C-alpha cells in the first residue's frame, strides 16, 4: 500500500516539474486592471431601506455609453424570469492607469423576504443572473 502512495506522489511531483511554463506570469497593473466592454466588478449593496431597495454598481470601458440592469423574482429554473429593466446612471472615471465608466442602479419597491435575480449589461451583452 505504501508503494502505491509513493509512486502516486512521485509521478504527481514529476508532473509539476515537467511543466515549468505553467508558472503564472506577472501582468502589469495597466493590463491586470484594464476595463473591457463586458461588465466587471459587479457589486450589490443596499440603499435606504435594505428590506425594499438594493443598489448595484459595475464597471465597463468607455466604449459602453449606457448601462442597463434587470431584476426579477427568482424561480427554481432560472429560465422563465420576467425581469424589469432599469437604466443606469453612468459616470466617467479616470485613474492613473486607465479610464472607465461606472454604472449604478437602485432597485426600489422590492418585496421583503423575497429572493430576486439580477443581471447587468448594456442591453446586448449581459452578466449571468446573480
Annotate each language-model stretch with its function:
Residues 1-4:
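Positively charged n-region of N-terminal signal peptides that target proteins for export
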Residues 7-15:
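Bacterial N-terminal signal peptides
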Residues 18-130:
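Acidic, histidine-bearing metal-coordination/catalytic regions of metal-dependent phosphoesterases
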